[in-house]
């Protein structure tokens, strides 16, 4: 039943994925270039979430919403359509630190990227025996070819483009 649900979800979302890809690609050339991102680096429990929340209050900074994190390929279509339903499904706060979660709370772009590409240290959480390999390739690009790195950059740029179009 779980495999059937996964296949059904993938097939059902395919028209939205393809449509959103076509739309975002058609906008890429005429779109104002996206400024280079600012990366917030820090150790867990060091205040990075607070800094991100403070910065997100200034309109010059963009954020990755919970919907973009969960539906990065369909954020403009399914994300909008299901926003009321998804809003009800959001937890009141993050379980690890009691920080409130709202539909416009900034989230880590790395989680969205993990949903979009195989190059992410987050995959090591699901495959702990390969954690070191996922970490090194996802953080340091260790062992990746130039083509792999270019593919990751394209996915990152696609995510940021969609966030500016949404």
Task: List the model feature ranges, each with a label.
Residues 40-59:
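Glycine-rich phosphate-binding P-loop
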Residues 45-46, 59-60, 151, 155-157:
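Phosphate-binding loop of NTP-binding sites
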Residues 1-29:
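A transmembrane-helix-recognition feature enriched in membrane-embedded lipid enzymes
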Residues 68-166:
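PAPS-dependent sulfation machinery
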Residues 57-67:
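Post-Walker A helix-loop "phosphate-sensing" segment adjacent to the P-loop in P-loop NTPases
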Residues 18-40, 69-81:
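N-terminal signal-anchor transmembrane helix
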Residues 33-35, 45-46, 166:
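Short, well-ordered loop/turn elements at secondary-structure boundaries
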Residues 5, 9, 38-41, 45, ...:
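Short, charged/polar micro-motifs that form catalytic or ligand-binding hotspots
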């Amino acid at each position: 039943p779980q495999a059937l649900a996964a296949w059904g979800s993938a097939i059902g979302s395919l028209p939205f994925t393809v449509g959103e890809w076509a739309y975002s690609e058609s906008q890429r050339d005429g779109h104002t270039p996206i400024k280079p991102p600012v990366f917030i680096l820090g150790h867990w429990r060091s205040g990075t979430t607070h800094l991100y929340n403070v910065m997100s209050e200034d309109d010059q900074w963009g954020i990755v919403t919970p919907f973009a994190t969960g539906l990065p390929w369909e954020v403009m279509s399914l994300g909008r359509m299901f926003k009321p339903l998804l809003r009800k499904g959001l937890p009141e706060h993050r379980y690890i630190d009691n920080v409130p979660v709202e539909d416009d709370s900034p989230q880590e772009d790395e989680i969205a990227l993990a949903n979009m590409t195989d190059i992410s240290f987050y995959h090591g959480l699901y495959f702990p025996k390969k954690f070191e390999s996922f970490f090194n390739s996802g953080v340091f690009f260790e062992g990746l070819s130039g083509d792999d790195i270019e593919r990751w950059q394209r996915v990152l740029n696609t995510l940021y483009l969609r966030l500016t179009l949404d």
